[in-house]
């Protein structure tokens, strides 16, 4: 009698974690690609990320998705073997145990760029306004620039934080040809092709205090937060003249697809997964 090979073990780790849709997403990716795997949610104490993650890998785990509030701690855990994107982001959302080495990557920016492409947005030559200067904003700057944006302006409620983020990005090496600037929310300017809300304002049923006149003809407003209904930022953008609005559900699926590729070497199709998740959100509303 032959024994079956052990299932490859993966998980998402965070606090809180019960809301995470990652197990469902990776199960659908696995079904698409014919891969057998086990994927679970792992809650970690706020002061116990390292111990929990190390125990998972010592028990044979092969990959972890990392969510709030542990992305910076994951960066430190994998500091010796970080991808260029993770170094720029200062955060890791994908940990991989491979050949006796713990590797760290950040797939958030790739997930965002791929979702913008799915939406039909022209990134080459685009003028982009990024609202927010926290970890979510930092994680997407480099991929957006590499995708061809001509101008990126960072604005934040605390303009000093926007300036600090721009300085850190400049020090790490901004791709040539990208015009950059930073300022306060009321210094956002106008005629932007893409406006991305990288703050958590919509989670609190609020929109950033942005001035009017932000949007160029045909512009997209994109909120990294997602839900069954349009977010406060999306509603604000529509009222201000944005031609298109989108939430961050596609970014969630896109970053998961990139993690799946890192782990398995196969690219799943996110479209069907996104359709299923959107239907689930509507049913839960």
UniProtKB/Swiss-Prot annotation:
PANTHER family the record matches: BIFUNCTIONAL 3-DEHYDROQUINATE DEHYDRATASE_SHIKIMATE DEHYDROGENASE, CHLOROPLASTIC (PTHR21089:SF1), SHIKIMATE DEHYDROGENASE (PTHR21089)
Catalytic residue list: 71
Function: Involved in the biosynthesis of the chorismate, which leads to the biosynthesis of aromatic amino acids. Catalyzes the reversible NADPH linked reduction of 3-dehydroshikimate (DHSA) to yield shikimate (SA).
Keyword Cell cycle annotated: no
Molecular-function GO terms, alphabetical: NADP binding; shikimate 3-dehydrogenase (NADP+) activity
Name of the protein in question: Shikimate dehydrogenase (NADP(+))
Record text on subunit structure and interactions: Homodimer.
One Pfam family it belongs to: SDH_C
Keywords: Amino-acid biosynthesis, Aromatic amino acid biosynthesis, NADP, Oxidoreductase
Protein EC: 1.1.1.25
Record pathway: Metabolic intermediate biosynthesis; chorismate biosynthesis; chorismate from D-erythrose 4-phosphate and phosphoenolpyruvate: step 4/7
GO biological process entries: amino acid biosynthetic process; aromatic amino acid family biosynthetic process; chorismate biosynthetic process; shikimate metabolic process
Native source organism of the sequence: Bordetella avium (strain 197N)
Catalytic activity field: shikimate + NADP(+) = 3-dehydroshikimate + NADPH + H(+)
GO cellular component, as recorded: cytosol
């Amino acid at each position: 009698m032959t024994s079956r090979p052990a299932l490859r073990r993966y998980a998402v780790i965070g606090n809180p974690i019960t809301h995470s849709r990652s197990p469902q997403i990776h199960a659908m990716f696995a079904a698409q690609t014919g891969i057998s795997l086990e994927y679970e949610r792992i809650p970690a104490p706020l002061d116990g990320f390292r111990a929990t993650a190390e125990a998972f890998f010592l028990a044979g785990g092969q990959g972890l998705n990392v969510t709030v509030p542990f992305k910076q701690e994951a960066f430190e855990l994998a500091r010796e073997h970080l991808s260029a994107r993770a170094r720029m982001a200062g955060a890791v959302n994908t940990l991989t145990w491979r050949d006796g080495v713990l590797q760290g990557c950040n797939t958030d920016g790739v997930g965002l760029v791929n979702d913008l492409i799915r939406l039909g947005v022209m990134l080459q030559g685009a003028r982009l306004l990024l609202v927010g200067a926290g970890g979510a904003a930092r994680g997407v700057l480099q991929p957006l620039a590499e995708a061809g944006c001509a101008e990126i302006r960072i604005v934040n409620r605390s303009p000093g934080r926007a300036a600090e983020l721009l300085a850190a990005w400049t020090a790490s090496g901004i791709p040539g040809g990208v015009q950059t600037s930073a300022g306060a929310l009321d210094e956002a300017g106008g005629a932007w092709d893409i406006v991305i809300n990288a703050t958590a304002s919509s989670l609190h049923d609020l929109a950033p205090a942005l001035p009017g006149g932000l949007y160029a003809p045909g512009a997209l407003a994109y909120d990294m937060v997602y839900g069954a209904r349009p977010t406060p930022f999306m509603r604000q953008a529509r009222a201000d003249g944005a031609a298109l609005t989108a939430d961050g559900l596609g970014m969630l699926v896109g970053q998961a697809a990139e993690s799946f590729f890192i782990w398995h070497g196969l690219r799943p199709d996110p479209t069907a997964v996104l359709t299923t998740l959107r239907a689930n959100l509507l049913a839960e509303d």
